């Protein structure tokens, strides 16, 4: 059981109590769950699909592997994994039940539900034994975690020796001019778009603020190494709008 704490953390550009952040994040995704996939397409111009395919290309799923997809939401990563890996199994864990409900409905439509398990849970306290999974993925979720080092430590714990971590997350553009243009788009277009599509501007204001606060590629790679992972590498996607980070438990 997690003890109550008066420590603070960030929720976008706001400062909040650590104990409150998970509930705030849960509220964001409860509000947008029904339109989550549509908004991803609109915000990225469909690029999130290309990025997720690039994630699978680098990951190269193998038959009979066991995947844990954390913050797995509506199942995009797990579905891609299972379609490439015969006889593989996947557990999708998410803090927000409404996201998992949407994912289950998609899994039934794609006839993948028999190879999937869905679980409400916290990335910082995974309900699994040590050395339980071959692959751990988290896509556009790690920046929402209250204590990222704790989540990375849990990822390391539940992976088997030889297991692989793969993180897809929005990142920082190395080119200052492109970063400025991207910020203008993010802060001036995405929240109003969220208001029109989901009737929820605030959740998408949080989204763009959380992206801007997330560590750059090298800093996040260092955090992964500190958690114990070896052979940590990253690849920029679309000039650094997003990045893939990979690490191994050896």
From Swiss-Prot:
<comment type="function">
    <text>Methyltransferase required for the conversion of demethylmenaquinol (DMKH2) to menaquinol (MKH2) and the conversion of 2-polyprenyl-6-methoxy-1,4-benzoquinol (DDMQH2) to 2-polyprenyl-3-methyl-6-methoxy-1,4-benzoquinol (DMQH2).</text>
</comment>
<keyword id="KW-0474">Menaquinone biosynthesis</keyword>
<dbReference type="InterPro" id="IPR029063">
    <property type="entry name" value="SAM-dependent_MTases_sf"/>
</dbReference>
<comment type="pathway">
    <text>Cofactor biosynthesis; ubiquinone biosynthesis.</text>
</comment>
<keyword id="KW-0808">Transferase</keyword>
<keyword id="KW-0831">Ubiquinone biosynthesis</keyword>
<dbReference type="InterPro" id="IPR023576">
    <property type="entry name" value="UbiE/COQ5_MeTrFase_CS"/>
</dbReference>
<dbReference type="GO" id="GO:0032259">
    <property type="term" value="P:methylation"/>
</dbReference>
<keyword id="KW-0949">S-adenosyl-L-methionine</keyword>
<feature type="binding site">
    <location>
        <position position="74"/>
    </location>
    <ligand>
        <name>S-adenosyl-L-methionine</name>
    </ligand>
</feature>
<dbReference type="Pfam" id="PF01209">
    <property type="entry name" value="Ubie_methyltran"/>
</dbReference>
<keyword id="KW-0489">Methyltransferase</keyword>
<protein>
    <recommendedName>
        <fullName>Ubiquinone/menaquinone biosynthesis C-methyltransferase UbiE</fullName>
        <ecNumber>2.1.1.163</ecNumber>
        <ecNumber>2.1.1.201</ecNumber>
    </recommendedName>
</protein>
<feature type="binding site">
    <location>
        <position position="94"/>
    </location>
    <ligand>
        <name>S-adenosyl-L-methionine</name>
    </ligand>
</feature>
<dbReference type="GO" id="GO:0008425">
    <property type="term" value="F:2-methoxy-6-polyprenyl-1,4-benzoquinol methyltransferase activity"/>
</dbReference>
<comment type="pathway">
    <text>Quinol/quinone metabolism; menaquinone biosynthesis; menaquinol from 1,4-dihydroxy-2-naphthoate: step 2/2.</text>
</comment>
<dbReference type="GO" id="GO:0009234">
    <property type="term" value="P:menaquinone biosynthetic process"/>
</dbReference>
<feature type="binding site">
    <location>
        <begin position="122"/>
        <end position="123"/>
    </location>
    <ligand>
        <name>S-adenosyl-L-methionine</name>
    </ligand>
</feature>
<dbReference type="InterPro" id="IPR004033">
    <property type="entry name" value="UbiE/COQ5_MeTrFase"/>
</dbReference>
<dbReference type="GO" id="GO:0043770">
    <property type="term" value="F:demethylmenaquinone methyltransferase activity"/>
</dbReference>
<feature type="binding site">
    <location>
        <position position="139"/>
    </location>
    <ligand>
        <name>S-adenosyl-L-methionine</name>
    </ligand>
</feature>
<comment type="similarity">
    <text>Belongs to the class I-like SAM-binding methyltransferase superfamily. MenG/UbiE family.</text>
</comment>
<dbReference type="GO" id="GO:0009060">
    <property type="term" value="P:aerobic respiration"/>
</dbReference>
């Amino acid at each position: 059981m997690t003890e109550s704490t008066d420590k603070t953390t960030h929720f976008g550009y706001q400062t909040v109590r650590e104990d409150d952040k998970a509930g705030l994040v849960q509220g964001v995704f409860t509000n947008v769950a029904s339109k989550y996939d549509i908004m991803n397409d609109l915000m990225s111009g469909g690029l999130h699909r290309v990025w997720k395919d690039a994630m699978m290309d680098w990951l190269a799923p193998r038959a009979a592997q066991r995947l844990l997809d954390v913050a797995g939401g509506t199942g995009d990563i797990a579905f891609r994994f299972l379609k490439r890996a015969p006889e593989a199994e996947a557990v999708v864990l998410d803090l927000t039940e409404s996201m998992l409900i949407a994912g289950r409905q998609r899994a039934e439509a794609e006839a993948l539900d028999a190879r999937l398990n869905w679980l409400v849970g916290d990335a910082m306290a995974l309900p699994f034994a040590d050395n339980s999974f071959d692959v751990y993925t988290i896509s556009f979720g790690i920046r929402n975690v209250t204590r990222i080092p704790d989540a990375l430590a849990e990822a390391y714990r539940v992976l088997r020796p030889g297991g692989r971590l793969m993180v897809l997350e929005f990142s920082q553009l190395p080119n200052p001019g492109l970063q400025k243009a991207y910020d203008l788009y993010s802060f001036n277009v995405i929240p109003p778009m969220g208001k029109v599509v989901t009737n929820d501007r605030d959740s998408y204001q949080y989204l763009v603020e959380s992206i801007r606060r997330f560590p750059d590629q090298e800093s996040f790679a260092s955090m992964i190494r500190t958690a114990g992972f070896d052979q940590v590498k990253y690849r920029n996607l679309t000039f650094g709008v997003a990045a893939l980070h990979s690490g191994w438990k050896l």
